[in-house]
Regions:
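Bacterial N-terminal signal peptides that target proteins for export
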Residues: 1-9
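Flexible, solvent-exposed loop/hinge segments and secondary-structure transition points
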Residues: 21-148, 152-156, 160-175
Length: 175
């Protein structure tokens, strides 16, 4: 096989494989739980949403609910750990939100990032903007949460996801 024949075959194959090489798992569920709630015990408490709850969350947040079941853990001493996914530009971003006992955001962690660009959303300073936000916060990109150039869709969708999870807390978790 000549070099040109090899290049003719290898180039299309590499184009198919290349996008997947940008996917990165930064944290497992256990690692994210320890990062957000160090030294705390967490108990799985998945929530299956009733149609009325799903509709109420969508109305309260203005964000579509993609799944009827939400992966949730109750934190000893109060608080919640919620695992979620949003679509970045083309691929899913898996992230976790830690909520304090009062329902305010304690911390968010980006666990899996599969997009080619926009990984800057993992930056601690960007993620820290969510701390203290509640369901009463407006959570608008470019107003409450600063955008990152080159990561606009990832920023917008994480912001929308957190807003949806805060509404989820109010409707499905708060007692």
């Amino acid at each position: 096989m000549t070099k040109s024949e090899f290049a003719f075959i290898a180039l299309p194959i590499s184009a198919l494989v290349a996008p997947s090489t940008f996917a990165a798992q930064y944290l497992t569920v256990d690692q994210a739980q320890r990062a957000i709630f160090p030294g705390k015990s967490l108990t799985a408490a998945p929530v299956k949403l009733a149609p009325a709850q799903r509709k109420a969350i969508e109305q309260a947040s203005g964000v579509r609910v993609l799944h009827d079941e939400q992966q949730v853990w109750r934190v000893s001493g109060g608080g919640w750990f919620i695992l979620d996914e949003v679509v970045g530009k083309h691929e899913f971003i898996t992230y976790a939100v830690g909520l304090n006992a009062d329902g305010s955001v304690k911390q968010i962690e980006i666990m899996d990032y599969r997009e080619t660009y926009g990984g800057q959303i993992r930056d601690q300073n960007w993620r820290a903007q969510f701390a203290g936000k509640t369901s009463k916060s407006t959570l608008k990109l470019d107003r409450d949460i600063k955008n990152i150039s080159g990561a606009t869709l990832s920023c917008r969708h994480i912001t929308d996801g957190v807003k949806r999870l805060l509404a989820f807390y109010e409707i499905a978790l708060k007692h």
